[in-house]
Amino acid sequence: MVSSNQDLLISPSIPYGEIAVPPSKSHSLRAILFASLSKGTSIIENCLFSPDSQAMLTACEKMGAHVRRIGDSLHIQGNPDPHHCHPRYFHMGNSGIALRFLTALSTLSPTPTLITGSHTLKRRPIAPLLSSLKQLGAHIRQKTSSSIPFTIHGPLSPGHVTISGQDSQYASALAITAALAPYPLSFSIENLKERPWFDLTLDWLHSLNISFLRDQDSLTFPGGQSLESFSYSVPGDYSSAAFLASFGLLSSSSKPTILRNLSSQDSQGDKLLFSLLKQLGAHILIGKHHIEMHPSSFSGGEIDMDPFIDALPILAVLCCFAKNPSRLYNALGAKDKESNRIEAIAHELQKMGGSVHPTRDGLYIKPSRLHGAVVDSHNDHRIAMALAVAGVHASSGQTLLCNTQCINKSFPYFVIAAQTLHANVRHYQADFPLRSSFCR
């Protein structure tokens, strides 16, 4: 294996310090989309600028929004009636949110839209959403029923449909579309997973004065509603915070790691991870706008992953350092993310000496001493950052983490952030084979 400047060289170190958490990817993408569909000009402060954000911005500009970037803020003049544009082509990059949300919104237009994306986006399931949209009258042409590319257009017909809840983005996409449809639409969610992330979408709609009725997992939208412009400051990303927090929690330092730019009132699903760690015995202080991590030991256990399924890779690393074995379960959806995260994190941690084994719907993990190794990100940002944490807290040896460009998806300045916390993580480039250099 030959290293490139997309690789990271990681050495055991003792992290501590204070840092601002990057803006939330989930909130940034929703803010961009809603601003682009609103009347007037919206201002989004502290927006995350990443490949996913750019994919969403590009698509929204094709729908008629006018976007101006000023520093870390966006001024977006929306187009509340984007559905009578010329035929459109949306390249979603590697963004699952953009794929699902804009696919559903495209059915409000009689104009065909070609939906495509990166090679890795083709592995992200879309069939359950397309099936429900077809039942409402959407016209879809595709070469394969399971992935992009495809052409889609409406109009939809008023009615009721059932949507799979296996991925919360299906239900979120349908809710956003129903909110802006000119006619009544209702739907029921079958076996809703990742509930906090669907609730986050509904919180957004509620804050934008969209009316709907909710009876458990059935929702009814009256039709004929529109969005008004707004000002919004994106809070910190709890999913990204989990990696920074893990640097500090596993450290042998006597000093804490303090994470700022977080809102205790936020509905992000991965916020619940910090409450879980506290319940397991970790020394964590949760403030209104910050979290303070003190190096401490904690127990493993039986952990239902559904509320924070994106945290599976980093929780797998943490459980290697727990006082007793752990079983992470109810995480089938982790198989359909940017990688099969269950298989990917198990495979890579096994290289580092971890006793991490896939199960039908998660992982079984025994406490393990990790060592340096050559590992790979599987082109998945959360796998990459979890392995960086593992490398920093390995008991011996350096870790070469390959193919880390994917980290830009949610945390473009991850390496700088790690270094700010005194973690020995740096870009690495060499012109010779490296594998033998990283053996124990």
Curated annotation (Swiss-Prot):
The keyword DNA damage does not apply. GO terms for molecular function: 3-phosphoshikimate 1-carboxyvinyltransferase activity. Pathway: Metabolic intermediate biosynthesis; chorismate biosynthesis; chorismate from D-erythrose 4-phosphate and phosphoenolpyruvate: step 6/7. It is found in: Cytoplasm. The active site is at D310. It is an enzyme of class 2 (transferase). Its EC number is 2.5.1.19. One of its GO terms (biological process) is aromatic amino acid family biosynthetic process. One of its GO terms (cellular component) is cytoplasm. It catalyses: 3-phosphoshikimate + phosphoenolpyruvate = 5-O-(1-carboxyvinyl)-3-phosphoshikimate + phosphate. 3-phosphoshikimate binds at K25, S26, R30, S168, Q169, D310, K337. Phosphoenolpyruvate binds at K25, G96, R124, Q169, R341, R382, K409. Keywords: Amino-acid biosynthesis, Aromatic amino acid biosynthesis, Cytoplasm, Transferase. PROSITE patterns: EPSP_SYNTHASE_1, EPSP_SYNTHASE_2. Monomer. HAMAP family: EPSP_synth. Belongs to the EPSP synthase family. Catalyzes the transfer of the enolpyruvyl moiety of phosphoenolpyruvate (PEP) to the 5-hydroxyl of shikimate-3-phosphate (S3P) to produce enolpyruvyl shikimate-3-phosphate and inorganic phosphate. This is 3-phosphoshikimate 1-carboxyvinyltransferase. The gene is aroA.
